[in-house]
């Protein structure tokens, strides 16, 4: 696992087309923004595990774009 340190407003880039930006930190929560192509699925881990287990994905909301 690669471990990086970023400040609010800073980003990392993955594969030239995915950008992850730190939007804010409040206590133990970190808000991140993810810019990715439409064909790249982005899910929270607990949603991804549900999808893998065959459960239906929840309705479209903040997890998808």
Curated annotation (Swiss-Prot):
SUPFAM superfamilies with a match to the protein in the record? CsrA-like (SSF117130)
Keywords, comma-separated and alphabetical? Activator, Cytoplasm, Repressor, RNA-binding, Translation regulation
One function term, GO molecular function aspect: mRNA 5'-UTR binding
Q: Say which domain of life the source belongs to.
A: Bacteria
* Compartments, as annotated in UniProt: Cytoplasm
Gene3D superfamilies membership: Translational regulator CsrA (2.60.40.4380)
**Biological processes, Gene Ontology terms:** mRNA catabolic process; negative regulation of translational initiation; positive regulation of translational initiation; regulation of carbohydrate metabolic process
Q: What is its main location?
A: cytoplasm
Q: InterPro entries, from UniProt?
A: CsrA, CsrA_sf
Q: Name one GO cellular component term.
A: cytosol
UniProt cross-references to PANTHER family, sorted A to Z? CARBON STORAGE REGULATOR
Family statement drawn from the similarity comment of this UniProt entry: Belongs to the CsrA/RsmA family.
Q: What does the annotation say about its assembly with partners?
A: Homodimer; the beta-strands of each monomer intercalate to form a hydrophobic core, while the alpha-helices form wings that extend away from the core.
Query: What is this protein's function per UniProt?
Result: A key translational regulator that binds mRNA to regulate translation initiation and/or mRNA stability. Mediates global changes in gene expression, shifting from rapid growth to stress survival by linking envelope stress, the stringent response and the catabolite repression systems. Usually binds in the 5'-UTR; binding at or near the Shine-Dalgarno sequence prevents ribosome-binding, repressing translation, binding elsewhere in the 5'-UTR can activate translation and/or stabilize the mRNA. Its function is antagonized by small RNA(s).
Protein name, please? Translational regulator CsrA
Q: Which organism is it from?
A: Pseudomonas putida (strain ATCC 47054 / DSM 6125 / CFBP 8728 / NCIMB 11950 / KT2440)
